């Protein structure tokens, strides 16, 4: 035992989590620094980050705390929220998440730490689950094609609107008609999306007002926000006769009993899958859906899972029709959506599979029966029910009693929806019991006696009209009719997760994606009732805890970035970009400079940048990059001068997408400002800056951050995400507003998310991470991320050229290696290397972005030296295999790279390859101790798009 007595502070270990989060320990850091030839961490940082942007002081954040203390503080936030019985409805409902799904999907790192399935061979489990979602949505809506989720119902409606405008070539109108009984938050989002695109939104009664307008599409709510169920067949027929398209926003549970939109003639169906087992989460994250006719499939926004075949001709899943998406088509994409809501879509699909069609119908019939009992009881108590035909919602005329009834409900810890001064709304859900109905009746009866539920049940009548009762079957596929016992569901989920690679098994070195640790303590509070059982439109005095946490998180993010104000409403990075550009646009308009509509974007930018710019009505002008990957200052000056009178903004990622800190970033910002433009710093790479420099201090006017990158929200296999925007003081008045937020700034832009605080349910994750790390820990994490990236670059440089470095030879938090020469030397492609990495148990780095034919590697700070070396060993071994091809040991078409990934079926099948089975499946000896087997061989992408199938294939194909 040492003679030195430790201090009490040392024994308390308040900074212990920092060492849990950061992979390399001090000895490993020293070894890596020695390998780089630098004396210490500060020397490395000074050679990497330009001195002109370094901050001189530490972050103004509380010191680090223990995991137990963070959870205790979070519990205090949660206890300040009030969990009432909520009947507000408006697209959000209480639901019962089956615990087998809660534990084995939402709380399982095998699912929530996975990345978007761009590498399909190692994503077969979640691709199958998402295909189940698409099949379920297609069946329920009666449509031919559904995508793999959108961000929320309001966004889905806005996407459907712009989709109709794209595909409806017969109609040149710029009017979009919205039924007045659509969800209010949907109407707000649609109006906000329409305005910069020059679309006029008309809200009215479609039965009366539609004939008075020339319109290109109509949006109808089914059932309406106040509960009304209407037959829209004739109205849709009339729209079609006018060459207009029809969108129906349909409640997913009601479609088990109601005639589906497709059978009513709708062209597009949208909605929210939240009530299929996903908690309220104070408004999100939830998986919206969009479904349409086959003829419009190439105009669908978002991700689309399709069925293809692998190299052996066996069935395999992949993302289909990717040429629609922003990462390929940029400003010509169908949408700027990148991250969607994969994890929540998977949860909803498993809820559907667990209950099956009969179970879902039983739930729906129970909800409807209880609603009819409530309506009958209200009538017998002397209340007038305004809703004649309904599914789960009624509006009640309360006249002069409105306030009294509403307050009486609150006294009983019941939330009703206040429609207006004379009307209250009640929406029932899966969690409602007969006792709940009795309690509601007592509230509305105002002390008068009410009949008991059993008596009312005998006289209550079905409120769905005969002509709208669903006759068609749905969810007939075996996957929805097999896994109804917990044992079967548990094993199905395990089988699927075993097919995939996620952070629970391996490092995911995706450049520009920041696949860092999602710590268990950070994830724990997400499923607490105090956070997950709060309705987004609950009275503000019931959400004090959430709003205090949100305000504190905004303060933390401001401290980290140097921005004056934040909005946490954007529920994806793409939405943050969109909101930030809208704020810039509104700022210019407020100054009488509304004609500023040119957005300068470097050629190296992420595809969401130009896609977002076109969504706000801006014209994209590309700026060249120089040979070192930096913004070409001469070309920037030229373009800024050419467009000076109309320059709205520059969008620049920092550090650059080429993986370096551009030393001229202050000059870049200055050039744009000199010509009246605003500077948008894309925060995708903030993981290289926290604690070292602040975009709000070196020239940025606005940035979006990716909380699902830098601040530890998991990627979920393609969502959820949060993309908050930080702004300088002059842009603060133009942050997104929302009618449910209480007071909103006069100049606030329209909401860009359906819920006032977006995906609020996952904000505790980022708060917890920042709280446990403190300013000191966050800074150390940034330094370690830079160290890890430079170590990988150093180890790989003798084998692969590192394409870009800073002026002193170092990279930021990621590096790009050039594999293009191999195509010329021996025919090996970047795809071959990516697939071969699967045999080594790794997800490939980012392929062909931002430079075609390259790999961009980002290890993050969470990976240990052992894992970094394991990856480097794999890459070096692959280089030796390439050299063997170059030396003529075997040709590329018969090489391990060409046949990768190797499956267990390959191993036991006929082997006619010039290399051994062991070389194919165990290229390194260490793999024998822990081997990941790809469930499929290399997938044929061309076949999948030419033979597009985006629903579950028949079970005979599983058997084969």
Curated annotation (Swiss-Prot):
Its EC number is 1.4.4.2. The gene is gcvP. The glycine cleavage system catalyzes the degradation of glycine. The P protein binds the alpha-amino group of glycine through its pyridoxal phosphate cofactor; CO(2) is released and the remaining methylamine moiety is then transferred to the lipoamide cofactor of the H protein. Its cofactor is pyridoxal 5'-phosphate. SUPFAM superfamilies: PLP-dependent transferases (SSF53383). NCBIfam families: gcvP (TIGR00461), PRK00451.1 (NF001696), PRK04366.1 (NF003346). InterPro entries: GcvP (IPR003437), GDC-P_C (IPR049316), GDC-P_N (IPR049315), GDC_P (IPR020581), PyrdxlP-dep_Trfase (IPR015424), PyrdxlP-dep_Trfase_major (IPR015421), PyrdxlP-dep_Trfase_small (IPR015422). The modification N6-(pyridoxal phosphate)lysine is found at residue 709. GO terms for molecular function: glycine binding; glycine dehydrogenase (decarboxylating) activity; pyridoxal phosphate binding. It comes from Hahella chejuensis (strain KCTC 2396). The glycine cleavage system is composed of four proteins: P, T, L and H. This is Glycine dehydrogenase (decarboxylating). GO terms for cellular component: cytosol; glycine cleavage complex. GO terms for biological process: glycine decarboxylation via glycine cleavage system. Belongs to the GcvP family. It catalyses: N(6)-[(R)-lipoyl]-L-lysyl-[glycine-cleavage complex H protein] + glycine + H(+) = N(6)-[(R)-S(8)-aminomethyldihydrolipoyl]-L-lysyl-[glycine-cleavage complex H protein] + CO2. PANTHER family: GLYCINE DEHYDROGENASE (DECARBOXYLATING), MITOCHONDRIAL, GLYCINE DEHYDROGENASE, DECARBOXYLATING. The keyword Oxidoreductase applies. Keywords: Oxidoreductase, Pyridoxal phosphate.
């Amino acid at each position: 035992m040492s003679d030195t007595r430790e201090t009490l502070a040392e024994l308390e270990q308040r900074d212990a989590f920092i060492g849990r989060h950061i992979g390399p320990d001090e000895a490993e850091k020293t070894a890596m620094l020695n390998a780089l030839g630098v004396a210490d961490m500060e020397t490395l940082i000074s050679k990497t980050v330009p001195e002109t942007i370094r901050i001189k002081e530490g972050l103004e954040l509380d010191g680090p705390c223990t995991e137990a203390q963070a959870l205790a503080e979070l519990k205090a936030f949660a206890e300040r929220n009030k969990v009432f019985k909520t009947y507000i409805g408006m697209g959000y409902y209480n639901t019962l998440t089956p615990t087998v799904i809660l534990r084995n999907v939402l709380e399982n790192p095998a699912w929530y730490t996975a990345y978007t399935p761009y590498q399909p061979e190692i994503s077969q489990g979640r691709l199958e689950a998402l295909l189940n979602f698409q099949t379920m949505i297609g069946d329920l809506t009666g449509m031919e094609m559904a995508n793999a989720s959108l961000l929320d119902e309001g966004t889905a409606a806005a996407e459907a609107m712009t989709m109709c405008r794209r595909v409806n070539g017969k109609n040149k109108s710029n009017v979009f008609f919205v039924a007045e009984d659509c969800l209010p938050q949907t109407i707000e989002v649609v109006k906000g999306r329409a305005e910069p695109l020059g679309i006029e939104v008309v809200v009215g009664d479609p039965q009366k007002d539609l004939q008075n307008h020339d319109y290109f599409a109509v949006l109808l709510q089914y059932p309406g926000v106040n509960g009304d169920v209407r037959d829209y067949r004739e109205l849709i027929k009339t729209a079609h006769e006018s060459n207009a398209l029809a969108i129906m926003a349909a409640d997913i549970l009601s479609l088990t009993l109601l005639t589906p939109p497709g059978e009513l003639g709708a062209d597009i169906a949208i909605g929210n899958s939240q009530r299929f087992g996903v908690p309220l989460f104070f408004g999100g994250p939830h998986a919206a859906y969009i479904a349409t006719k086959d003829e419009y499939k190439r105009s669908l926004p978002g991700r689309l899972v399709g069925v293809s075949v692998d190299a052996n001709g066996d069935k395999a899943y992949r993302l289909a029709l990717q040429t629609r998406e922003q990462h390929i088509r940029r400003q010509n994409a169908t949408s700027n959506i990148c991250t969607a809501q994969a994890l929540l879509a998977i949860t909803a699909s498993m809820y559907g599979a667990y209950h099956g069609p009969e179970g879902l119908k039983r739930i729906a019939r129970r909800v409807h029966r209880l609603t009819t009992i409530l309506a009958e009881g209200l009538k017998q108590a002397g209340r007038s029910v305004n809703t004649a035909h309904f599914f789960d919602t009624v509006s009640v005329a309360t006249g002069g009693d409105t306030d009294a009834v509403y307050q009486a409900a609150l006294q009983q810890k019941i939330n009703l929806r206040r429609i207006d001064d004379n009307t209250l709304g009640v929406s029932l859900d899966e969690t409602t019991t007969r006792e709940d109905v009795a309690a509601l009746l007592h509230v509305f009866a105002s002390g008068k006696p009410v009949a008991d539920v059993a008596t009312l049940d005998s006289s209550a009548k079905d409120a769905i009209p005969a002509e709208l009762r669903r006759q068609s079957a749905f969810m007939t596929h075996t996957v929805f009719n097999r896994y109804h016992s917990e044992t079967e569901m548990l094993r199905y989920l395990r089988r699927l997760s075993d097919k995939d690679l996620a952070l629970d098994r391996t490092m995911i070195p995706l450049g520009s994606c920041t696949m860092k640790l999602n710590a268990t303590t950070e994830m724990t509070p997400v499923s607490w009732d105090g956070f997950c059982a709060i309705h987004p439109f609950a009275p503000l005095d019931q959400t004090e805890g959430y709003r205090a946490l949100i305000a504190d998180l905004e303060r933390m993010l401001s401290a980290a970035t140097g921005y004056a104000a934040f909005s946490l409403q954007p529920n994806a990075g793409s939405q943050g970009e969109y909101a930030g550009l809208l704020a810039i646009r509104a700022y210019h308009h407020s100054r009488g400079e509304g004609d500023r509509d040119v957005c300068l974007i470097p050629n190296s930018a992420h595809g969401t940048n130009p896609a977002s710019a076109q969504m706000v009505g801006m014209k994209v002008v590309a700026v060249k990059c120089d040979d070192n990957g930096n913004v070409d200052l001469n070309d920037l000056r030229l373009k800024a001068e050419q467009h000076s009178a109309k320059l709205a903004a520059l969008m620049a990622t920092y550090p650059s997408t080429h993986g370096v800190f551009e030393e001229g970033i202050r000059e870049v910002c200055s050039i744009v400002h000199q010509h009246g433009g605003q500077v948008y710093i894309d925060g995708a790479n903030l993981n290289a800056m926290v604690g070292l420099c602040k975009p709000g201090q070196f020239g940025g006017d606005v940035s979006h951050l990716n909380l699902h990158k830098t601040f530890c929200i998991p990627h979920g296999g393609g969502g959820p995400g949060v993309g908050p925007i930080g702004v300088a003081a002059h842009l603060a008045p133009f942050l997104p507003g929302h009618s449910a937020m209480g007071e909103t700034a006069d100049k606030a832009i329209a909401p860009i998310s359906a819920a006032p605080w977006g995906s609020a349910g996952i904000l505790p994750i980022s708060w917890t991470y920042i709280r446990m790390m403190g300013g000191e820990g966050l800074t150390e994490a940034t330094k370690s991320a830079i160290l890890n990236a430079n170590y990988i670059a150093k180890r790989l440089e003798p084998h692969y050229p590192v394409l870009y470095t800073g002026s002193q030879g170092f990279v930021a938090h990621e590096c790009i290696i050039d594999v293009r020469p191999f195509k010329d030397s021996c025919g090996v492609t970047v795809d071959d290397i990516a697939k071969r990495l699967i045999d080594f148990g790794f997800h490939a780095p980012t392929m062909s972005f931002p430079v075609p034919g390259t790999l961009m590697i980002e290890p993050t700070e969470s990976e240990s030296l052992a894992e970094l070396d394991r990856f480097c060993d794999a890459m070096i071994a692959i280089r030796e295999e390439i050299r063997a091809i170059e030396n003529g040991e075997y040709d590329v078409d018969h090489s391990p790279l060409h046949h990768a990934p190797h499956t267990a079926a390959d191993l036991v099948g006929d082997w006619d390859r010039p290399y051994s089975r062991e070389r194919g499946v165990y290229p390194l000896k260490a793999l024998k101790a822990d081997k990941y087997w790809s469930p499929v061989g290399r997938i044929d992408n061309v076949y999948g798009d030419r033979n597009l199938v985006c629903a579950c294939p028949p079970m005979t194909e599983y058997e084969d």
